[in-house]
Structure formats: C-alpha cells, structure tokens
Amino acid sequence: NIKVEKKAGGSVSDSQIVNGIVLDKEVAHSGMPKKIENAKIALISAPLEIEKTEFEAKINISDPNQIKSFMDEEDKILRDMVEKIKSANANVVLCQKGIDDIVQHYLAKADILTVRRIKESDMSKLAKATGGRIVGNVNDLSEKDLGLAQNVEEKQIENDNWVFVEGCKNPKAVTVLIRGGSQRVIDEAERSIHDALMVVKDVVERPLMLVGGGAPEAYVAVKLR
C-alpha cells in the first residue's frame, strides 16, 4: 500500500511522502480545472464512451435526417454519463479506461477534473487512500461511492505534469515521491527506501531482532568466560 514514484531532478532532500496517491498522468482536457479543493472523487473502472459491439453491425440510412437522429442519440448517451456523475456530486473523475472526446467536453464544461487510463494497481491504491469505491458502471455511481481528498491538483514535475491526490484522511495507501539529481541517484534512493520498508514490515510482523557489529558473539563470549 506504499506507492513509490521517482523523477530525476532537484535533490534527494526534495523527496516527500504524500498522504495520498501521485499519478504520472495529466488532466484529460485542457479546459478542465487543474486544481480541485475538497475533492469528491468518482473512481470508475469502465470506459466513459459508447462500447463497440462484439460483432460487426451495419446501419441502413435512407434519409439524411436519420443520420442526425443517430448522432443526437449517441450524444445523449454520452451526455447522460456526465449527468450521472454530476448528480452524484463528484467534482473529480479518475477513470481506468478511455474517455470519449464528447464526454471530456461536457466534463470540462461542468468544471470536473478528470484523469483517464489509470493503471488498475493505482485505482486500487486510490480506493484505499480516499475511501472511495471503484464503480464498474457509471450508471451505478452514487454519492456514497465517492472518495474524499483535501485537494486534487495537476503539478509540473520537471517537464511532465502529474496529478496529486493529496490530504486524504487516514489513508490506507500513500506515495513516496523520490527526487534526485540523476537517474542513478534516484534508483539508489529507491533501493534504500525499499530495504528500509522491508525492515519495518518484518519488525511489525515479527517483533524480533538480532543486533549486528559482533554484539551477540561478544555477549556469548563474556558468558562463557
């Protein structure tokens, strides 16, 4: 439940622990807000788009008006997805799959910060950090499924934009963001942090330890003499 992200640049002293999850993703649409305070987060594992059928389908159109009707119906389906998100009072959407351009447009108009194509492992950590529930169908989304965070913000890390989900209350998952002057430095820092975390894990699971530096041998020698 500890996510480790690393980015070359700055110094090791710039490394930090985030009480939440850092995503190496940017906001999906340029018209969306880059920061949301008091975030109410919808975690959606399904695509926010019209799913393709498993079999090839053809539509016979005999009247130009039918094209408009077809496109209007498609637009309505996509718009209804956004309305469902709005009705749940979400102001942030974190989606594991793709999001249709039309859905992105309506989400931007509603000032809902959105991130797409998030890794499944990150979705699981987001649920643990925010207390939200991952929903497999947007139509099943309700306010009780939403996760909470003090703020969700897109920040520039060197030449990339990453999204920080921060200020989660009693998070069950957190992020360690490692910085350093070179890739070699941050790789070494990551190994050191991993070793330290494994030591803590072992001590918590089995509160036993053996001191080093020859102390056990010296103690035995004293007793034998």
Which ranges hold each PLM region?
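Core, soluble structural subunits of large cytosolic macromolecular machines
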Residues: 1-225
